[in-house]
Swiss-Prot record:
The lineage of its organism: Eukaryota, Viridiplantae, Streptophyta, Embryophyta, Tracheophyta. Residues 23-35 have a biased composition (Low complexity). Coiled coil: none annotated. It holds the Pfam family HATPase_c_3. ATP binds at E124, N128, D170, M175, S190, G191, Q214, F215, G216, V217, G218, F219, T269, R464. Keywords: ATP-binding, Chaperone, Mitochondrion, Nucleotide-binding, Stress response, Transit peptide. This is Heat shock protein 90-6, mitochondrial. Residues 784-799 have a biased composition (Acidic residues). Belongs to the heat shock protein 90 family. It comes from Arabidopsis thaliana (Mouse-ear cress). Molecular chaperone which stabilizes unfolding protein intermediates and functions as a folding molecular chaperone that assists the non-covalent folding of proteins in an ATP-dependent manner.
């Protein structure tokens, strides 16, 4: 006998129990288990019920293991036998049911819930007609007899405005009676999808095709505008023509053979739409033409619409019988007949679409004039674009595209957050899908880029109106963005500098928004940025030009943000930098500061705001700093005590040369410019404003005479009231000159007037008059004088 440890027995029990469950499941899955199987399952069930629940009285008597069947064998546990007999019956077999649908309700959902725009019915029907023509063209390669009855492959649309009827006819492959039942009688069954699958399975299938359909619901979009649809079709595979007829609110349709000689067609399909009362405006020939040009302009086959035309001709004008004849007229002179021009009207078929899109041509064969003409026509523009890019991408995603940079911003220079634009027209197999995107193909900061994108395989929803989010779309977006940047970079590198100046004037703010929102493309955006600087106040420079002009010892790119170039160049922060010849960028647009801070660095050079603390100009002299700190250190503490919580600290400045003091922002706080902007946009939340502006550093210039006098005042009489007032006024002056807004402008004005009074006292007045004026001023405060009336006296003393 083999002895097993407790752990081994436990493992074997679990293994056996699992095997039993598998076996039991297999036995119950059979529809009619045999009696032997039921008996064996019953026995095994009782054994493992006893083993796993610890109910066996003879726990030591079943140590045998049958290795062949992986079952424990031993004594039968009689106490559980009765219970297992009652539960050994196999469950009854499950019945299988098919889903049922209320067809009329389902049709209503498909028609009215899938499509958001009724206009797409024509796009869907034209796409189906194009697929029918494509099928015929493919099959005719191996069987030329299919196309002998009607050699012309085209689509014709007739609009009867008076009766509200639209008829669309194609000379495609047509349908047999059975195909009518399968394709039009079965919802969501796509004959085109089946055909494409057959092409892929065929050894003779070509690599590329223009077949459009895939969902099998496009035909039913006809019920968006029609309450009755009649389909007459003739397949070259059959000698008979059949008519399919259905109504919008019906759950059934009819099919019958068409025996009317006048309605027979050589081959193809004719769809007749009897429009609803509210949709009869679609039967206007001009509107049909407009819809074709919008949605199906580049379908592979010619589309003709029935249009009214006219030509001008001259006709004779009959003489007026009331006109008197001239008696003296020479009878021999031949009279000249009077004519007038009239327009002769007639109806005829007119080609409405262009079958060869420009983006399918080789870019080397397309001229600039053709690109510009397509841009003006496609986007209804009258100016030529600044640049264009025609490209094809292959690999995981294959698509063709032409992108344009418009010459001006259509929505205004300041509108940079308009997410939804109609600047990108998406086509799938030449059929227009949509131009209403919300960042799917381009980020909003590049929403000004216009163009067309055509792909053969994109994840669309069933209505083919919405581009679904997927990895393919993300890859496409990334490649489109890169091509757009390449196109803009080409403008910036052009010899014609005015082109990029025009671009920057219209779309510079868009790129700055990209610095904030698109960190992934910082390296592409940064070379395109332009700013004014301390060495270029009239012409903007690029960051590359700034880096080239940097001093050898310069380690950072310096900038200052302000509301104008004038205020930026006169700020006290620039004094020492201008002396050293260090260039400073002027950020004068509200978005500039945030954009540059988002970049953080360019070509391993950090951006440094010169209006913030801890400015390092690379000229530290520790011995000199120690001497100055020793001399003015206590004065700084004295000034800090006077200013209190207004400043975080008072320090010796290394950025001043002509100003006595300056107020700088904390390293992680808002600058004066940012604080001004945030106050303008504040909606009453002052807590965050106070928090971000809380840390300010008051820097003093030890070489300035005012600071030297303040230092002397501290050393002689630190409690002098005039010195205290001077510190307060010095702080307020620094507040204004540094770009901050004083909390109490009136109080600041009072301090200035007071100091002016002290400074101007005795400046122009005589010493004798001054005490008298002061005495009169004091007496005026004590009492009120009555006015003395003085009579006028002439020069000679007479009244």
């Amino acid at each position: 006998m083999i002895r097993l440890s407790k752990r081994s027995v436990s493992t074997l029990l679990r293994s056996g129990n699992q095997s039993f469950r598998i076996a039991a499941a297999a036995s119950t899955s059979r529809s009619s288990p045999s009696a032997t199987d039921v008996k064996r399952s019953d026995t095994e069930s009782r054994w493992y019920s006893s083993l796993t629940n610890g109910q066996s009285k003879n726990s030591g008597s079943f140590a045998q293991l049958n290795m062949k069947t992986n079952w424990f064998m031993g004594y039968r546990n009689e106490s559980s036998a009765a219970a297992s007999d009652s539960s050994s019956q196999a469950p009854p077999p499950a019945e299988k049911f098919e889903y049922q649908a209320e067809v009329s309700r389902l049709m209503d959902l498909i028609v009215n819930s899938l499509y958001s725009n009724k206009e797409v019915f024509l796009r869907e029907l034209i796409s189906n007609a194009s697929d029918a023509l494509d099928k015929l063209r493919y099959l005719s390669v191996t069987n030329p007899e299919l196309s002998k009855d009607a050699p012309d492959l085209d689509i014709r649309i007739y609009a009867d405005k008076e009766n509200g009827i639209i008829t669309l006819t194609d000379s495609g492959i047509g349908m047999t009676r059975q195909e009518l039942v399968d394709c039009l009688g079965t919802i969501a069954q796509s004959g085109t999808a089946k055909f494409m699958k057959a092409l892929k399975d065929s050894k003779d299938a070509g690599g590329d095709n223009n077949l459009i359909g895939q969902f099998g619901v496009g035909f039913y979009s006809a019920f968006l505008v029609a309450d009755r649809v009649i389909v007459s079709t003739k397949s070259p595979k059959s000698d008979k023509q059949y008519v399919w007829e259905g109504e919008a609110n019906s759950s059934s349709f009819t099919i019958q053979e068409d025996t009317d000689p006048q309605s027979l067609i050589p081959r193809g399909t004719r769809i007749t739409l009897h429009l609803k009362q509210e949709a009869k405006n679609f039967a206007d020939p001009e509107r049909i033409q407009k819809l074709v040009k919008n949605y199906s302009q580049f379908v592979s086959f010619p589309i003709y619409t029935w249009q009214e035309k006219g030509y001008t001709k001259e006709v004779e004008v009959e003489d007026d019988p009331t006109e008197t004849k001239k008696d003296d007229q020479d009878d021999q002179t031949e009279k000249k007949k009077k004519t007038k021009k009239v327009v002769e009207r007639y109806w005829d078929w007119e080609l409405t679409n262009e079958t060869q899109p420009i983006w399918l041509r080789n870019p080397k064969e397309v001229t600039t004039a053709e690109y510009n003409e397509f841009y003006r026509k496609a986007f209804n523009e009258y100016l030529d674009p600044l640049a264009s890019s025609h490209f094809t991408t292959e690999g995981e995603v294959e698509f063709r595209s032409i992108l344009y940079v418009p010459p001006v911003s259509p929505s205004g220079k300041d509108d940079i957050v308009n997410q939804k634009t109609k600047n990108i027209r998406l086509y799938v197999k030449r059929v227009f899908i949509s131009d209403d995107f919300d960042g799917e193909l381009f980020p909003r900061y590049l929403s000004f880029v216009k163009g067309v994108v055509d792909s053969h395989d994109l994840p669309l929803n069933v209505s083919r109106e919405i581009l679904q989010e997927s990895r393919i779309v993300r890859i496409m977006k990334k490649r489109l963005v890169r091509k757009a940047f390449d196109m803009i970079l080409g403008i910036s590198l052009s010899e014609n500098r005015e082109d990029y100046e025009k671009f920057w004037d219209n779309f510079g703010k868009h790129l700055k928004l990209g610095c904030i929102e698109d960190r992934e493309n910082h390296k592409r955006i940064a070379p395109l940025l332009r700013f004014f600087s301390s060495q270029s106040e009239n012409d903007m420079i690029s960051l590359d030009e700034y880096v080239e002009n940097m001093k050898p010892e310069q380690k950072a790119i310096y900038f200052i943000a302000s509301d104008s170039i004038t205020s930026a160049k006169n700020a006290p922060f620039l004094e020492k930098m201008l002396e050293k010849g260090l260039e400073v960028l002027y950020l004068v647009e509200p978005i500039d500061e945030v954009a540059v801070q988002s970049l953080k660095a360019y070509k391993e050079k950090d951006f440094v705001d010169i209006s913030k603390e801890d400015l390092d100009l690379g000229d530290k002299n520790e011995e000199k700093e120690a001497a100055v700190k020793k001399e003015f250190g206590q004065t700084c503490d004295w000034i800090k005590k006077r200013l209190g919580d207004k400043v975080a600290s008072v320090q010796i400045s290394n950025r001043l040369s002509s100003s006595p003091c300056v107020l700088v922002s904390g390293k992680f706080g808002w600058s004066a410019n940012m604080e001004r902007l945030m106050k303008a946009q504040s909606t009453g939340d002052t807590i965050s404003l106070d928090y971000m502006k809380g840390r300010r550093v008051f820097e003093i210039n030890p070489d300035h005479s005012i600071i030297k006098n303040i230092n002397a005042a501290y050393n002689s009489n630190p409690n002098d009231e005039d010195a205290m007032r001077a510190i307060d006024l010095m702080y307020d002056a620094a507040l204004v000159s540094s770009g901050f807004t004083p909390d109490n402008p009136a109080e600041l004005g009072g301090k200035i007037y007071e100091m002016m009074d002290v400074a101007l006292s005795g400046k122009w007045s005589s010493p004798e008059v001054q005490p008298q004026q002061q005495q009169m001023a004091h007496s005026h405060d004590a009492e009120t004088f009555e006015a003395e009336v003085v009579e006028p006296v002439e020069v000679d003393g007479k009244k």
